[in-house]
């Protein structure tokens, strides 16, 4: 993983963890296991794709997965709206050279194993590599 991919993911994770501290139990880089896996809702952020557009510009595709045990999906919907606002705020305050506000590319709802329900938000962005 490129150094700035990691830096972007770390900044976004911190922004979501602090901005959603009253709504979620945590933000993770992979699905938690053990006792953490039974405390809902939580967010998992994954890098789906990243590639160089040219020598200076890199494309990053992130999947933000909201995992909940609310079968109606209302909890995930509420959190996803807040995520959009938090990403907009992150874009306006970051010191990284992001070339435009993260774009929501796709949204999917999925029933997971056990009683988990998830909403998957696919965000894309381009940035200048330093």
Predicted regions and their residues:
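Short, charged interaction patches at domain edges and termini
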Residues: 1-14, 47-57, 98-130
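Small/polar-rich, solvent-exposed N-terminal microdomains that initiate assembly or binding
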Residues: 1-54, 74, 85, 90, ...
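Conserved beta-strand segments that form the floor/walls of ligand-binding pockets within enzyme
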Residues: 44, 65, 122
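Short beta-strand-to-loop capping motifs
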Residues: 66-70, 125-127
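Short, conserved charged micro-motifs
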Residues: 71-78
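Short amphipathic alpha-helical coupling segments at ligand-binding clamshell hinges
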Residues: 79-83
């Amino acid at each position: 993983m490129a150094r700035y991919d990691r830096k972007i993911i770390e900044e976004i994770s911190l922004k979501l963890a602090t901005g959603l501290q009253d709504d979620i139990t945590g933000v993770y880089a992979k699905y938690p296991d053990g006792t953490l896996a039974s405390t809902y809702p939580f967010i998992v952020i994954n890098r789906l794709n990243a590639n160089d557009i040219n020598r200076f510009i890199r494309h990053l595709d992130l999947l933000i997965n909201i995992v909940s045990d609310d079968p109606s999906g209302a909890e995930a919907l509420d959190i996803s709206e807040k995520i959009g606002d938090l990403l907009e705020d992150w874009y306006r305050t970051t010191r990284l050279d992001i070339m435009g506000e993260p774009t929501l590319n796709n949204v999917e709802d999925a029933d997971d194993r056990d009683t988990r329900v998830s909403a998957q938000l696919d965000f894309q962005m381009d940035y200048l590599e330093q």
